[in-house]
Amino acid sequence: MSQGKVVQIIGAVVDLEFPQDAVPKVYDALKVTEGGLEGLVLEVQQQLGGGIVRAIAMGTTDGLRRGITAKNTGESIMVPVGKKTLGRIMDVLGNPIDEAGPIGEEEKMSIHRAAPSYEEQSNTNELLETGIKVIDLICPFAKGGKVGLFGGAGVGKTVNMMELIRNIAIEHSGYSVFAGVGERTREGNDFYHEMNDSNVLDKVSLVYGQMNEPPGNRLRVALTGLTIAEKFRDEGRDVLFFVDNIYRYTLAGTEVSALLGRMPSAVGYQPTLAEEMGVLQERITSTKTGSITSVQAVYVPADDLTDPSPATTFAHLDATVVLNRDIASLGIYPAVDPLDSTSRQLDPQVIGDEHYDTAMGVQEVLQRYKELKDIIAILGMDELSEEDKLSVSRARKIQRFLSQPFFVAEVFTGAPGKYVSLKDTIAGFKGILDGDYDDMPEQAFYMVGTIEEAVEKAKNL
């Protein structure tokens, strides 16, 4: 293949000069062949004319200098796919980083692929039970759907995601792919050991491009994970694809965008924000052969949901789980906001009348409580009508019953985790709404699984 020379380096963006008749194509992978940086991969982004191409480095450019040779591989970045990737940690290029020997893959695939066509796509309305009460009730997940976990810093996106992986891996025994995009290395490490301890590691492929990696890695690692998930789907499986965190994918694009010579747009984001997001999200879809159900953590800068990055992500999702700092500060975990979270599945034709009516009833009572809060703060509970007093009392019980102990948080809380079936969830909330538990103290509903546990707890209070 043709060889070129490095002519300019600005951070993670490198310009190379190739012979005029052998200029690499966009997305071709170039490999550095000398200077102690053998194996460094550069991905072509632009052809600037005159034989010069501009590329993003998939690794640190420390020690790279002008005049160093790089050869064109003639293909885009290829990563290992298939069953051999299960239980392994890989980087953006598919190299193992868990010190457990080579992957030994039977097949490699390009990380750049076209999204499935209209004919290939399928849509079913099957629910995916997660065992987390607030999610199953208020914003149920569809099998083969896309879910976003929205939240600011430190409200529990990663813990919620780990609980979902644990529940789905153990209760549904499917394959999962986890892409760690620009998150803390410590969390990636915890995550690996957590999966190992709960014996689900052999069902998960892990792809990491953490915070300390150059922007090229963080920009492409989501595509690496997605390619592995697509392979499982094309084999006819139902696969889960987890991304933590989709915001860092956008951020990596922002970091290289200006260096690639693009003019920044709103809030300094790249002008290609919507297109970059679309390229990733449109590939996460279910076909007639298999399904990809995706759960994506979305960091919300400064808790502002109108920021261009979370706002662009919203458009692609079937269900949104919004985590709220005010709820977390009350000690209610998972800190899901039942009034802000939505799902397309929340439709009586999909989930049935009983589930729908219960979910609507819960939201109605909580909304009423929210409206009355100001009056209570100024005048106290005594000034409310009997009807409103009852509403407030039920709302506070519901609010506490929406909390639940997590399996992955057992080490911190000391309380054993709970998996609650959808049937039990609906029965519990319906009972509270119907007034069956009006005589029980609200503490009895805090951090329990089913309503039966709340009744038991009330006896000991």
From Swiss-Prot:
It is a peripheral membrane protein. ATP binds at G151, G152, A153, G154, V155, G156, K157, T158. GO terms for cellular component: plasma membrane; proton-transporting ATP synthase complex. Keywords: ATP synthesis, ATP-binding, Cell inner membrane, Cell membrane, CF(1), Hydrogen ion transport, Ion transport, Membrane, Nucleotide-binding, Translocase, Transport. Pfam families: ATP-synt_ab, ATP-synt_ab_N, ATP-synt_VA_C. It catalyses: ATP + H2O + 4 H(+)(in) = ADP + phosphate + 5 H(+)(out). HAMAP family: ATP_synth_beta_bact. F-type ATPases have 2 components, CF(1) - the catalytic core - and CF(0) - the membrane proton channel. CF(1) has five subunits: alpha(3), beta(3), gamma(1), delta(1), epsilon(1). CF(0) has three main subunits: a(1), b(2) and c(9-12). The alpha and beta chains form an alternating ring which encloses part of the gamma chain. CF(1) is attached to CF(0) by a central stalk formed by the gamma and epsilon chains, while a peripheral stalk is formed by the delta and b chains. This is ATP synthase subunit beta. It comes from Idiomarina loihiensis (strain ATCC BAA-735 / DSM 15497 / L2-TR). The lineage of its organism: Bacteria, Pseudomonadati, Pseudomonadota, Gammaproteobacteria, Alteromonadales. The gene is atpD.
